[in-house]
Amino acid sequence: MNRRGHAGRTDANQSRIIEALRKLGATVVSTSQVGQGLPDLLVGWRGVTILMEIKDGARPPSERKLTEAEAYFLAHWRGGPAVVVNNEQEAINAVLAHRRGDR
């Protein structure tokens, strides 16, 4: 089974999602260059690190499917929260749903 993924490819809405999360006060690091199924962003928010896979909600559902590598990674991840988001509001909601403290 190939789990290499598509390193370097980013969804059109990624920069808008990053901007929205930073305006919220989150620390955001893009990991989209890594590939191997690793989600696109590391998001730090009030003591929690969230892995965030970005899909472009403007595209048809068939074009938003997880790659084999992404699905494998998310199914086997044993760390903190890992979510899939399609737009800025979903990203903000995911961050607000996962907070530990007021750091």
Residue positions per predicted region:
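Catalytic phosphate/metal-binding cores of nucleic-acid and nucleotide-processing enzymes, i.e., regions
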Residues: 1-103
